């Protein structure tokens, strides 16, 4: 049962005790006293859960019995959250004390699903990559990037570890799709589902958080597997989400190019990613069937948001 006016903070963490030691005090300082904080310990081996129990007994800790990765850990934490608004933060994010002041007013609009935060470089205070993400369809695939313009409120996607959202809409959309395991594209997919279902994604540059970008995935997977998972999930993103006949035809036309030239350029990684994605095609189509009942906005209209 959701509790009106309660804010829940969910922080997934794997072997991130050193990051929580650094950033958790700022998280607690920035939240209203009535907020609840949930840390999902993703089967860490660094004593995270015991450290939290000793130093922050009021924080709820979800202890995964095995390593479930980012998406599933977030889903578990959000399912436990009682607040109407959930703030999802990576363990390497350090929010400014007043960052929520410019975020919460956006949720007075019931059509707003999520609000993204303005990420800044923690060293000199200059914006590194911001928090506003856009996308375009090119060469048969959906590519994503962060534009130089980090002041415009319109966005196509937000970072899953640096945003707040309406839990009721999250539940309706189904949360992070585990189709995109073990990592990558789940946050972009969820934002896409929200936009296609008629909801709004907002970027709020005044909501400042410092993001240290200490990549757990790089340590876990290495660069080759990261490229493999990213390409696999890029294909699955198209197969699950794109409904425009023109874009789907374009995807088929460009596939031979990618299967030959992109495979050569990536030293075989794309071909492996394609076959891995193909194995998951039935799952992607099942997921597509589930979410497509909510779709009311065309792909073309979503891509236009990148031009605003």
What are these language model-derived features?
Residues 64-81, 91, 102:
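Glycine-rich, basic loop-to-helix element that forms the pyrophosphate-binding segment
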Residues 25-34:
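Short, acidic, metal-binding catalytic loop of nucleotide-sugar glycosyltransferases
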Residues 86:
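Short aromatic/hydrophobic "clamp" motif used to bind/position activated sugar donors
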Residues 156-174, 179-212:
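A short, conserved alpha-helix in the catalytic core of glycosyltransferases
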Residues 93-130:
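Conserved donor NDP-sugar-binding/catalytic core segment of glycosyltransferases
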Residues 26, 41-50, 66, 94:
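A conserved acidic beta->alpha catalytic loop
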